Amino acid sequence: MPIKIPDTLPAFETLVQEGVRVMTETLAIRQDIRPLQIGLLNLMPNKIKTELQMARLVGASPLQVELSLIRIGGHKAKNTSEDHLLAFYQTWEEVKHRKFDGFIITGAPIELLPYEDVTYWPEMQEILDWTETNVHSTMNVCWGAMAAIYHFHGVPKYELKEKAFGVYRHRNLKPSSIYLNGFSDNFEVPVSRWTEVRRDDIEKSDELEILMESSEMGVCLVHEKRGRRLYMFNHVEYDSTSLSDEYFRDVNTGVPIKMPHNYFPHNDPALAPQNRWRSHAHLLFGNWINEIYQTTPFDVEEIGMDL
C-alpha cells in the first residue's frame, strides 16, 4: 500500500519519480483500510528536504500510511517558507488530542546547547511525555534521540573534540531483534553530529539495549526492552548528497570542517558519493512500520490504554 500525503506537497512528485507509491485522498477512501497514522515532528531547518527523506522510508512499506507533518508552535523556521508551513503543517497543540500509531522526532542543529537552554525545551518535554499515552511507537533521530533518552532515562550527551562526520561501519549487535530483521552483520551508516551518548551511561539502565554500534563512532541505535521507543543517533535517512551538502556549506561559509570520512570516492570532493546505506535504512524503517502494524490496536483511540 502507498503513503498518503497531500498531492501538492513538494515531496509528492519526487516520490512518484523514485517509484514510491503515493495516493490521493479519494483513492485512500476507496480502499476502505485503516491507514497507520504516522506523525513527523520536523525540527530541521530545511523541512522540505527532511519531509522527503522520511516520507521515502515510511512510504516504501506495503502498508497504507498516512503521514502528518507537525512542528513546534511559536518557533519560526529560518529555511522554510511560512506559506509551506501553513499549507502542510500543524502545530503539536493542534494535534495533541490525536492518537498516532507511530511518531518520528527528527534531529535539530542545536546539539551544543544544554537541553534546558533550548527555547522550545519545555514544549519538547511536554511532547515527549505525551508520546507515552498518545503514541504506540516512537522513532527518535539524532538530537531528537539524545533529547528523548535524556528526558526518559537521564542519559547525558557529551561534546566531541571535533565533529563526527562521514560514513562509518557499524555492527549488528542483536540479529534476533525485530528491528534488525534482514540486517547484515556489518553495514555503513552516515554520521553527522557534534555530541555523543556513551555505552557506560546506557548500560546503567536495565530498560535499554544497544542494537547497533561502531568501534569508531560509538552507540548508533538503542531500544527499550519493555517499551516501543527507538533511539537512532545517526542519519540512516540521509540522501546520497546530504554529507556533501553539509561539507560544501561549511567550506563556502568559512566554517572549519574536515572532509567527511569514507564518503567521497578516493577522497575527492569533485566525485559524486555512492549511497551505501540506503538498503539498511529501508530495512530499519520497514521493520519498525511492520512491528507497529503487528502490535498497534485496530481502533487507534485505544492507543495508550494498555498502560
From Swiss-Prot:
Subcellular localization, as worded in the UniProt entry: Cytoplasm
Residues the record marks as site: Important for acyl-CoA specificity: 111
Stored CDD domains: GATase1_HTS
This protein's encoding gene: metAA
Site positions (Important for substrate specificity): 192
Family: Belongs to the MetA family.
Enzyme Commission number(s) of this protein: 2.3.1.31
Xref: PANTHER family: HOMOSERINE O-SUCCINYLTRANSFERASE
GO biological process entries: L-methionine biosynthetic process from homoserine via O-succinyl-L-homoserine and cystathionine
Cysteine-cysteine disulfides: none
Reactions this protein catalyses: L-homoserine + acetyl-CoA = O-acetyl-L-homoserine + CoA
Residue positions of the active site: 142 (acyl-thioester intermediate), 235 (proton acceptor), 237
Associated pathway: Amino-acid biosynthesis; L-methionine biosynthesis via de novo pathway; O-acetyl-L-homoserine from L-homoserine: step 1/1
Protein name: Homoserine O-acetyltransferase
Function: Transfers an acetyl group from acetyl-CoA to L-homoserine, forming acetyl-L-homoserine.
Keyword Transferase: yes
One GO term describing the cellular component: cytoplasm
Pfam families on file: HTS (PF04204)
Residues annotated for substrate binding in this entry: 163, 192, 249
The keyword Cytoplasm is assigned to this record: yes
Principal subcellular localization: cytoplasm
Keywords: Acyltransferase, Amino-acid biosynthesis, Cytoplasm, Methionine biosynthesis, Transferase
Record-linked InterPro entries: Class_I_gatase-like, HST_MetA, MetA_family
GO function terms (MF aspect): homoserine O-acetyltransferase activity; homoserine O-succinyltransferase activity
